[in-house]
Amino acid sequence: MNLEEYFARTGYKGSLENQDLETLTDIFQHHIRAVPFENLSIHCGEKITLELEHVYNKIVHKKRGGWCMENNQLLGWVLKCLGYDTSFLGAYVFNPHENAYATIMTHLLVKVVIEGKAYIVDAGFGVSYQMWQPMELVSGKDQPQAPGIFRFTEKNAIWYLEKMRRKQYIPNQNFSNSDLLEKKDCRKVYMFSLEPRTVEDFCFQCTYLQTSPDSLFTKKSICTLQTTDGFRALIGWTLTETKYNYKENMDLVEFITLKDEEVEKTLKDKFNITLERKLVPINVKGFYTI
């Protein structure tokens, strides 16, 4: 494993001299625009494991993506190698269809401290809830970014992340009531404490999310990648392309339904992913909004 290979994978060619916020942001943005958030291994007969060497080989050599435990673990390793003050945290993701936070800690986060200020660096959420810049860990402060306005709120040592979105313009009216569309203007994303975590704390969750019939990830094949002006997502056979602030305070969301024979080419053309095994797309209704 080496940093040169990782940066070749993400296309980052900037300076590595300073462990500052500007460099961190640039490295982070290259990661989220090159490495998809995806769970395709589950739906093509592969097992997801959390050994760093396996994650590195999958993302850097095989040019795949991963979910939070893979993306953020790899990014955390990179930042630590560069000399950043880096640690892992664990979050409980909000389920909009149950209107409740998960009871299992399934989301791995990176915390970075720069000149005494703490930032959350999360390269593993995907779709419109994917931050584009590290977020300062302060309570009650609106932090506007291209995807929308993010905000942390702290209550009794628990931190909550929420996001305010823009209106959405959907040209294909057949999808105007899609269950993939978020209806609320303000959306809870996840909650977490500042207790340091290790990758080993997520071993049970990694197996559970791949195997449980109750897991979102067994119900939907997901591949999503941030672009320079929005993001793409392939959920089952449904391809969406979102452009942020297409018009004032409005995002453009385009929907297409793919045929089986179009999925493989779309993964290659839109997400730069080539799978070694045959993907079996799945999209059980509910449980997930983009």
Swiss-Prot record:
Family matches, as Gene3D superfamilies: 3.30.2140.20
Family annotation (InterPro entries): Arylamine_N-AcTrfase, Arylamine_NAT_domain_sf, Papain-like_cys_pep_sf
Catalytic residues (UniProt): 68, 107, 122
GO molecular function: arylamine N-acetyltransferase activity
Catalytic reaction equation(s): an arylamine + acetyl-CoA = an N-acetylarylamine + CoA
Keyword Nucleotide-binding: no
Key words, A-Z: Acyltransferase, Transferase
UniProt-listed Enzyme Commission number(s): 2.3.1.5
Keyword Chloroplast: no
A UniProt-annotated Pfam family: Acetyltransf_2
EC category name: transferase
PANTHER family attached to this UniProt entry: ARYLAMINE N-ACETYLTRANSFERASE 1, N-HYDROXYARYLAMINE O-ACETYLTRANSFERASE
Family: Belongs to the arylamine N-acetyltransferase family.
Protein's name according to its UniProt entry: Arylamine N-acetyltransferase, pineal gland isozyme NAT-10
Source organism of the structure: Gallus gallus
